[in-house]
Amino acid sequence: MLSLRLKKIVSLLDSQDKVVDIGCDHGYLGIYAIREKLVKSIILTDIKESALSMARKNVKNSNLDIPLIVSDGLNNINASDINTVVVSGMGTSTILHILN
């Protein structure tokens, strides 16, 4: 079940968006957005492989083809693959660091 916070974030996305979810945590936002065809594509990222483990498990269980990438912010993301960035569930200083 998607939290109210994640539902609000998803409601801001468009069906033509190519999204990267930075710090995806459990991957619920991406799984929901792809399953419901709310975005064109999504890439799930987190800073460490261990942080991606739950998202990787959830994506596998969803039977969806969603890429998961270890990345510090946008460092390992090809800009041509995305047009929308989601950064949520982190403190202000962390978000500002990622955006810089």
Task: Indicate where each model-derived feature is located.
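Conserved class I S-adenosyl-L-methionine
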Residues: 16-25
